[in-house]
Amino acid sequence: MNGKVIVITGALGALGRVVAETAQQRGARVAGVDHAPSPMAVATPERIEFGGVDLSDAKQAKHAIDAAAAHFGRLDALVNIAGGFTFETVADGDITSWQRMYALNVLTALNASKAAIPHLIASSAGRIVNIGAMGALQAGAGMGPYAASKAGVHRLTEALAAEHKGKITVNAVLPSTIDTSANRASMPKADFSKWVTPLELADVILFLVSDAASAVTGALIPVAGRV
């Protein structure tokens, strides 16, 4: 990670914070992008944050990505963590949930990737890592909108990998349930010890960003924890 410049979307969320902190600990310089307001008052040579960014809007995504590249002088990797979740059946749900999941999960990754690609091609080792979902491999009851949108992320990953082979590696990690406070609150009777931790996911994500993963592209990698 030493010296690599990484943009992380969803950087203020439970997973994004851990990935950003771990990347910095390993020597990377990090630009965080999030829909939430950033608590960071002043940028540093190692870290900058862009809060209040709607990545489902292509213009806002491009502005944030270009600003990050300008701050550091280059961009080596994009980690698309921004996204959302909903649980509702097709019969009881509403079309707006499907539209919202598509915007939060597919459009955010699409817009950030499209904005980052010119910068990543200029890097000697451009990387994109997306967050898919094991739940998108086979949707269960109530998982339709979320699973369909994450399946879209899987196909986006494969398309980008094919389009930029030899220039940028593009991969996705597919977690099971992530061990976060929000998930614990919504599933209090679950066995949390079986879930994948944010740090475990960060390790896989940052491997895919690293030089050691130069031969890996177009991969959808399940990170199941102990489920």
Please report, for each region that a protein language model flagged, where it lies by residue.
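Residue(s) in the substrate-gating loop at a strand-loop-helix junction
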Residues: 133
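Alpha-helical segment proximal to the catalytic Tyr-Lys
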Residues: 118, 161-163, 214
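Active-site helix of classical SDR
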Residues: 113, 149
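Conserved glycine-rich cofactor-binding loop
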Residues: 12
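Active-site loop-to-helix junction immediately N-terminal to the catalytic Tyr of the SDR YXXXK motif
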Residues: 93, 139-147, 159, 183
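Substrate-binding pocket helix/loop in short-chain dehydrogenase/reductase
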Residues: 89-90, 97-99, 128
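C-terminal helical subdomain
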Residues: 166, 172-173, 180, 190-227
